[in-house]
Amino acid sequence: MPASAECPPGPGPVQLVLLAALLASSPAALAEAPHLVRVDAARALRPLRHFWRSTGFWRSAGQGLSYNFTHLDGYLDLLRENQLLPGFELMGSPSGHFSDFEDKQQVFEWRELVSLLARRYIDRYGLEHVSKWNFETWNEPDHHDFDNVSMTTQGFFNYYDACSEGLRAASPALRLGGPGDSFHPPPHSPLSWGLLGHCLHGTNFFTGEVGVRLDYIALHKKGAGSSIYILEQEEAVVRQIKQLFPEFADTPVYNDEADPLVGWSLPQPWRADVTYAAMVVKVIAQHQDLLVGNSSSSVRYALLSNDNAFLSYHPHPFSQRTLAARFQVNNTRPPHVQLLRKPVLAAMGLLALLDGEQLWAQVSQDGAVLDANHTVGVLASAHRPAGAADAWRAAVLVYASDDTRAHANRSAALTLRLHGVPPGPGLVYVTFYLDNQLCSPYGEWQRLGRPVFPSPEQFRRMRAAEDPVATAPRPFPASGRLTLRRELPLPSLLLVHVCARPEEPPGQVTRLRPLPLTRGQLLLVWSDERMASKCLWTYEVQFSLDGQGYAPVSGRPSTFNLFVFSPDAAVVSGFYRVRAVDYWARPGPFSDPVRYVEAPAQ
């Protein structure tokens, strides 16, 4: 059955929910000239689009075919519950039925399957939701991994036409792109280049017309350990596409596997810590400044994504290409899984604080202006308010990154000057900071002796290093100008968040639900869909044995919509509620309380 391509197969619902919800510098040994970062909060440059975010049986599809959607329903329901949208690759051969897409009967059957699938989820979730999905062709067709399906060049074109017409039969609003491959220069990558030619000049298998729609061009270009190499390859491919197929000059371009390095399971120490986190931010800043926001660039760049929806395995819980470190804890009955946020997920939480209007920002050193292809860079944004629950805010995200290299005794001297901040009620600023000394669960795991099955206390110690270090809100200078001086280790991230006080406190937390982890531990997840402001200090989690008197159980501030409750007493049966607290210590309404009753020990 066609399904979203995420590996490895078989994670349980708790792991999927956790993945879905997951997100002191040393003196410099090598002296460098200080970096000056200037940001003008009154000078908006351009929009800042975040290019980087029932029964299971169905009626017969004809020809005596029927499909069991039970597992796919469950997975897509879980994504929907966690407010996520899939990139949906139309690939696979249910029960081995499909074997040859030059067989006309199978081409018609594939079209019917795609149409059936699309209609099913339009009926289930609504067209408004499903039309936001990115449907895409078979993953990396030039690698010829077709699950025992014979896929000639003509067969691949027939398959594409069936995907296109199947989706169109369900709704013309559904988009389809491809080929999701590397586009090596011709004569290499014949299916990728051939698909572009077919979409322009080929004959549609079903309509007989010349040409087939291609709503976006999907590339897979990775960095070989270099941040700028990703962008350089994208530009080279787009130049060649425009040279060979100028009709695609205005077609949106996706790089939905823009990873720093190939090989998700290859253990790399830098993937475990802030090195990876800072590099991801650097790649995004490079794309915004050198491509998306560059008026001289003709690339219609629409989406950057990383291929990191994997679950790590022993003995490399942290160092594979994942967002979370996975521990398979086999010394409990039954065995269970624990996931820890890696710094790369924490960095994505910082990126989420950026808003929709890019601000003028510049980095210089010794008087020379530096572009985004240097060790220190910046991305800044502002938000104009809409409504009483909202107010003006700005975010300045500074990275210090030497790509995949970490330098224990090297730092960058930074002077950050933010000016042009308009006066506003209760104006405050908060800083968030990530480095390998303060924010590394991996480093804590090493200090604990790299336990294979960490104890609850050891997990608590590692989780204490998951989030950025946050400084409490401080009044913003009345002059509208702020100067901060820092030594930024390589690697590190610093975000400065400036907020005026909204008239209203935070909205209500919704969709609170508890999920069991193991005996004496549970996971709470919730939604922030009613939060009109991003200026939140923390979520306060409270617990009650009887639903009457509640007490806080969350400690350090965190704005991730997830909390692991692992008390020393291992008593977790009771009632839970959560509320948001903003930068001005104003709480929002509590969520509706939920009750959790732990299953008796077996």
Could you tell me what each predicted segment is?
Residues 62-227, 240, 247, 263:
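Substrate-binding cleft and catalytic face of glycoside hydrolase catalytic domains
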Residues 257-403, 407-409:
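Aromatic/acidic polysaccharide-binding cleft in carbohydrate-active enzymes
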Residues 368-445, 491-497, 534:
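Carbohydrate-binding surface patches
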Residues 453-502, 576:
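C-terminal beta-strand-rich structural cap/linker in extracellular carbohydrate-active enzymes
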Residues 475-476, 553-560:
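Short beta-strand segments within Ig-like beta-sandwich modules, predominantly Fibronectin type-III
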Residues 520-535:
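Conserved aromatic anchor
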Residues 565-588:
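Beta-strand-rich modules
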Residues 581-602:
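Extracellular fibronectin type III
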